[in-house]
Amino acid sequence: MTASNAAIHLYGASLRHGQVRALDAVSLRIAQGERVAIIGPSGAGKSSLLHLMATAIQPSSGRLELLGEQPWALSARARQRLRARVGLVHQSPPLPPRQRVVTAVLAGRLGQWGTLRGLLNLLYPSDVPGARQVLAELGLADKLFVQCGQLSGGQLQRVGIARALYQRPQVLLTDEPVSAMDPVLADHSLALLNRHAQATGVTLVASLHAVELALAHFPRVIGIREGQVVFDCPAEAVTEQLLDALYANEQLAPPPTQGPTLTVQIPRC
């Protein structure tokens, strides 16, 4: 992979929230059209990493290159144009309760439309067939004119996915996109995202708690722990030993016993 074909390139990126280091010198490259899952324990920094990639937050140190641009070296207007090429699916999509589903989906292209068209779309949805089509792929065609406040958590997540698919971004970042869905819907939704990415050449990155879904749907898996990359390898190379090291919980470990000092090496992919 060369820098020229990297959709996302992080150079020693760190992120601090006050005294807490959320990300610690993360360096990685994700090629255009790649499909990558990010896994790790709660609080590992997965969401922070995705939001940094989306330019929602600026790294405290280090550098991000996104689609060949350095976002934080751009003017605010140029950075906004860059963001319009990136889709971000939130774990809990920030959809107003009284907003209709059709409007929520069409809002995926607000960054590509002018102000007037965006405002008119709130009153008179401009592409009802397009919204219906993408919702149908997620089993929500019958919810087209329902208010978002009437939907379940899993349905809201599917609306968030539909919105991102309608946007047609070059990079699609998804933060726990199926956490509120039952296993069948979660599997279907991730399969749909992957089919869409393969068909359109979109770069797809998803943070997931469910390791089995990450391994089943994504060719490349990155393990994050305490803000650092623990492993980065093909899904078929992820071993039980790697997962044990990634999810080891010192608070749940049994009390230490007296014995010789052991040196433990974490296997590399």
From Swiss-Prot:
Protein task: Part of the ABC transporter complex PhnCDE involved in phosphonates import. Responsible for energy coupling to the transport system.
Family to which the UniProt record says this protein belongs: Belongs to the ABC transporter superfamily. Phosphonates importer (TC 3.A.1.9.1) family.
Protein residues bound to ATP: G40, P41, S42, G43, A44, G45, K46, S47
Subunit structure: The complex is composed of two ATP-binding proteins (PhnC), two transmembrane proteins (PhnE) and a solute-binding protein (PhnD).
Predominant place of localization: membrane
SMART domains: AAA (SM00382)
Protein name, as recorded: Phosphonates import ATP-binding protein PhnC
Main enzyme class: translocase
Domain ABC transporter intervals: 8-251
Organism this protein belongs to: Pseudomonas putida (strain ATCC 47054 / DSM 6125 / CFBP 8728 / NCIMB 11950 / KT2440)
InterPro entries in the record: AAA+_ATPase, ABC_transporter-like_ATP-bd, ABC_transporter-like_CS, MetN_ABC_transporter-like, P-loop_NTPase
Cellular compartment(s): Cell inner membrane
Domain of life (superkingdom): Bacteria
Database matches in PANTHER family: AMINO ACID IMPORT ATP-BINDING PROTEIN, PHOSPHONATES IMPORT ATP-BINDING PROTEIN PHNC
GO molecular function: ABC-type phosphonate transporter activity; ATP binding; ATP hydrolysis activity
GO cellular component, one term: plasma membrane
EC number, as in UniProt: 7.3.2.2
Catalyzed reactions: phosphonate(out) + ATP + H2O = phosphonate(in) + ADP + phosphate + H(+)
Keyword annotations of the record: ATP-binding, Cell inner membrane, Cell membrane, Membrane, Nucleotide-binding, Phosphonate transport, Translocase, Transport
Entries under SUPFAM superfamilies matching the protein: P-loop containing nucleoside triphosphate hydrolases (SSF52540)
Keyword Transmembrane helix: no
Topology within the bilayer: Peripheral membrane protein
